[in-house]
A protein has these predicted regions:
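Transmembrane alpha-helical segments of multi-pass small-molecule transport proteins
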Residues: 119, 146-183, 198-207, 241-256, ...
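Hydrophobic alpha-helical segments and their helix-loop junctions in multi-pass secondary transporters
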Residues: 134, 138-147, 199-226, 248, ...
Length: 524
């Protein structure tokens, strides 16, 4: 049933019928139109809260440590976020139109069971990010407690595994706080985002003012020199850094339907994202560039691998109130972004893989456990590895998935989906036993080309362009395969075997009384 504004929902009898499908659970169900109430402000606040986080801060400070000056770093970040905004908006559209999350949307291209491939690939990356953010939040909580509790650092003894026992305890406490909010649900998340976003911006601005005051102005920043003296020297570091910037939000470029399915309109969700993402990312990055550069003047004894981490930087302050307030801000910001960006999608992904056994809450708990097992304290050990290994590395795989999804929805299907069939084991998206081999093959080709540079030195430039290579190769391959070997329609298969087919958007379990809905006709 399509509304005048273009949004689609199931009729009541069809919505009731899909509940009997093994592909259904309440967390994956299409959101009714009356519950799609997120406005422009909600999406702007979502991006502001996600952008104002320590990993964003580390992006710009990491580029500075790589040799860029302030304007080179900011241009790289602005361009990267502008580019990644394109697939984000393209994949946001089906969420708002059909009210479906990312794993269900992926069924259209990959098949009802094949969608587990992109969903679980995305989930693994998100688990890694969850662990990283939880470790950062734990560091902030540890610094906060050390500021207000005398002797906190040595309270429980010496270091274990390279970190103090209180650091491990703070990490587990922050991890538990994330799990608590997951079990409270999405409504609590929206409330946290609405007040956390402006609060974090104000506190960061205060820290910026302090840095400029202590460094006696911005003269140091304007005279900062780049380590690259020609375009030829700058280009290699620029392109891999740009790929890393795109990789930073490549996860959200896939699973944005998890949020836009609550959108009140296409216009509101699009405006909220266009206004908030590139501007807030660049603004926050600019703040971190100024603060980090000022810190070089204020604390000349500190190394760059310490200055790039604002938690370690604030730990140098002698004012207990400043440390406590700053770290409280970091804890709130990290909590908001971690749940929004790194829990919603993998929780839905795990629920999609096993819909009858795993709910959103259970999927969130799995995300938290896997995040610990990925050892985030090791992922953050090296600032250059954070950008050039972690971000660039996974961008090739996620870019390949984005290429397939966008090619399928916008070019193969022209934005038209059979909503009910996304929840049917036998329908338009069944393909071969629930798998569309064309999408799987296209994804594998994209990933192979994006990552082959890691093992073949001669092809290293392909890895530097990992997201672009994966996206382009997968999209082109998928379009060619769908043209050369198009899947057979379910109607043709049913005509061949003389079976019943379903007309309209509904699912009928074996043995159900389909005559009641008057939507099944016999094909002989």
């Amino acid at each position: 049933m399509q509304h005048s504004d273009g949004r689609v929902e199931l009729r009541p009898e069809a919505a009731e019928a899909i509940r009997r499908s093994p592909l259904y659970n309440k967390d994956l169900a299409p959101v009714p139109v009356e519950r799609r109430n997120w406005t422009t402000y909600n999406y702007a606040a979502l991006w502001i809260s996600m952008a104002h986080c320590i990993p964003t801060y580390m992006l710009s400070s990491g580029l500075i440590s790589a040799g860029m000056n302030w304007w080179q770093a900011l241009i790289t970040i602005l361009l990267g976020n502008t580019i990644v905004l394109i697939p984000i908006l393209l994949n946001s559209h089906p969420g708002t139109k059909y009210g479906i999350p990312f794993p269900v949307f992926a069924r259209a291209a990959y098949g009802t069971y094949g969608s587990n491939l992109p969903a679980l690939m995305r989930a693994i990356v998100a688990c890694g990010w969850f662990g990283i953010q939880a470790w950062i939040g734990g560091e902030a909580l540890d610094t906060f407690l050390a500021a207000i509790i005398p002797g906190w650092t040595i309270l429980l003894g010496g270091p274990i595994g390279g970190h103090m026992v209180t650091e491990w305890l703070s990490f587990l406490l922050f991890w538990g706080l994330n799990i608590y909010i997951i079990y409270r649900g999405m409504d609590l998340l929206r409330k946290v985002e609405n007040w956390a976003a402006p609060f974090v911006l104000i506190m960061t601005a205060l820290l910026l003012g302090w840095a400029i005051w202590k460094a006696h102005g911005l003269g140091y920043l304007l005279t900062q020199q780049s380590n690259f003296h020609s375009f030829r020297e700058f280009w290699p570091i620029f392109i891999i850094s740009l790929t890393g910037m795109i990789g930073f939000w490549a996860t959200l470029s896939l699973n944005m339907p998890d949020f836009t399915r609550f959108g009140h309109s296409q216009r509101e969700q699009a405006i909220g994202q266009v206004v908030a993402l590139p501007t807030t990312m660049t603004l926050f990055a600019a703040m971190s560039v100024v603060i980090t550069s000022a810190a070089l003047v204020i604390y000349p004894h500190m190394k760059m691998d310490e200055l790039w981490d604002p938690i370690k930087l604030v730990g140098q302050f002698h004012n207990v109130a400043v440390i406590a307030i700053s770290m409280f801000t970091v804890v709130v910001a990290t909590l908001a972004v971690n749940i929004a960006a790194n829990v919603v999608s993998p929780a839905n992904d795990f629920a999609n893989a096993f819909p009858k056994w795993i709910s959103f809450r259970t999927g969130g708990l799995i995300t938290g456990v896997v995040g610990i097992l990925m050892q985030p304290w090791r992922l953050l050990a090296d600032p250059s590895g954070y950008i050039f290994a972690w971000l660039v590395g996974y961008s090739g795989g996620l870019g390949s998935i984005a290429g397939v999804l966008i090619a399928d929805y916008w070019f193969v299907r022209n934005k038209r989906l059979e909503l009910g069939d996304l929840y049917r084991t036998k329908g338009s998206y069944t393909y071969s036993s629930g798998w569309n081999w064309r999408a799987v093959l296209a994804t594998l080709i994209g990933c192979t080309l994006a990552w082959i540079g890691l093992v073949v030195p001669l092809l290293r430039p392909l890895y530097d362009y990992a997201w672009f290579v994966g996206f382009g190769a997968a999209a082109i391959t998928y379009l060619l395969l769908m043209k050369i070997a198009p899947p057979q329609s379910p109607e043709a298969l049913e005509n061949r075997h003389g079976k019943s087919r379903v007309v309209g958007e509904a699912f009928y379990a074996p043995g159900s009384d389909s005559d009641k809905a008057k939507v099944v006709e016999q094909i002989s």
